[in-house]
């Protein structure tokens, strides 16, 4: 560590994309957006891109009056591997000591403001305790998702065994940092039927792909198209906050897309992909050519096929308008939710204080049974029953009855008749890939798009990501899986963008998801399909527990409530490549009464 602060010397920023020798003849995008035969020099070496070609106008170095400086502790106050929040007057900073070095970072996760001091420090990064996002402690950069922004990194100096931090006042208050991005310099942008990168689907995967391309220096045309009428938004929040408005859910403001030349096509439905001519056809007849294509169409919710299926006031929730209409119709009235998965249970929880009655219909014996197991499912079911939710289990809807075309009753196969003014369906989804059936792009028997570790389809130059894909899950021996989670879509979108630029990145992240019901958060990491045992530490009745899901001798997933940061800890261990054995958990259960999880740092087997 240096003994004083100094203004950094100007540097020439260069972005270099180098293909391996064997790959240099292939047509990959360079950071300029051109195909490699044009974007690379004749001798096969990479072109260098200078800062002035791609960066926004740099901010001036903060003047002394714009900064705050404070001595926060003695070097011996923190052990290696410890974190502490320290106050600088204008805001707090996360101070980290790792391998004898001190690092100062923003103290809140930019995703939803979790205090990172309560997270997990491991392998040179800190993992958020709430949703699992990871940040490099040396740079502040976002390394694993969810979220879009990174942390600010502040200057640290050591003098006479004292640790002093210097930080910009503005950075302390913002608590998030958007990475430097290229701007579009293509003369044809917005005025041509051709594009370098076309992204079909503007969810998490599509947006992260576009942003990653710009972060990596790609300065040619990017077009992002969506069926929605809105700019990209946090769809995962719809079922948790039915009153949320589009502007509240927006992931980026419209000025962001304008500033970085990411063109948006809203209410744009793709009907055909012509891979031979690298062309996409839209429903209105508009056509766009592409050099690289990302397919991130997401999924379509399943609907009922019973008698009366077309009556009014029966909803699937895909847009803010859907959510808002459900809330409006449910206020003071009778709501029925079909399906006790995450979406259905989140909607039911939200409506308990708004509707006159809330009923849940489910084919299984308990909510979440296949995902969380019988015991955890029953504990959560009891929480809902204590909040006035009525369950009708091991049955399904046989008829929807209407009066003057509007829903009045839901009839179950058990012959039970439920009064209903509004019905929400949460019975699963199917990949929205019908437009690809005649394209030559591979689909499996269920309609998913199979991709490899680099998010490549069977067609060169065509990538896929998000809810509509199956991919090899690295830490489960490359088992082909579909994981329709918000965090996973982020990660896949980044890998797709990196491989459009020939960076040979591979998808390698531990699935992480969460939900919130009645003010309580459930967190989950791993991939637990096929678990054969559940080991529970804590108190299910008090909803303070951690559940380890095992298959044979290995922990394959973990879930918790009021037990942070255990899920982030397990996720970090699994991400490191270390297996957690069932016997480790069993021994912990036998000998530990404290809830201490330090055993997870052991070497294991």
Swiss-Prot record:
The UniProt record lists the EC number as 1.-.-.-
Highest taxon of the source?
A: Eukaryota
Q: Where is this region: Disordered?
A: 18-44
Q: What class of enzyme is it?
A: oxidoreductase
Q: Which residues bind FAD?
A: 201-205, 235, 240, 270, 467, 514
State where the protein is found: Mitochondrion
Describe the location of the Rieske domain by residue ranges.
70-165
What Gene Ontology terms for biological process does this UniProt record contain? execution phase of apoptosis
The entry marks the following residues as binding [2Fe-2S] cluster, namely 109, 111, 128, 131
Q: Which Gene3D superfamilies match?
A: 3.30.390.30, FAD/NAD(P)-binding domain, Rieske [2Fe-2S] iron-sulphur domain
Protease as a keyword of this entry, yes or no, is no
What InterPro entries is this protein classified in?
FAD-oxidoreductase/Apoptosis, FAD/NAD-bd_sf, FAD/NAD-binding_dom, FAD/NAD-linked_Rdtase_dimer_sf, Reductase_C, Rieske_2Fe-2S, Rieske_2Fe-2S_sf
Give the GO cellular component terms, alphabetically. Answer: cytosol; endoplasmic reticulum; mitochondrial inner membrane; mitochondrion
Q: Where is the composition biased (Basic and acidic residues)?
A: 18-29
This entry's Gene Ontology molecular function terms read: 2 iron, 2 sulfur cluster binding; metal ion binding; oxidoreductase activity
Alphabetically sorted, this entry's keywords are: 2Fe-2S, Apoptosis, Electron transport, FAD, Flavoprotein, Iron, Iron-sulfur, Metal-binding, Mitochondrion, Oxidoreductase, Transport
Q: Which cysteines are joined by disulfide bonds?
A: none
Claim: Disulfide bond is one of the keywords in the record: no
Q: What does this protein do?
A: Induces apoptosis through a caspase dependent pathway. Reduces mitochondrial membrane potential.
Q: What is known of its domains?
A: The Rieske domain induces apoptosis.
The family note in this entry says: Belongs to the FAD-dependent oxidoreductase family.
Protein name from the UniProt record: Apoptosis-inducing factor 3
UniProt organism field:
Mus musculus (Mouse)
Lineage in the entry? Eukaryota, Metazoa, Chordata, Craniata, Vertebrata
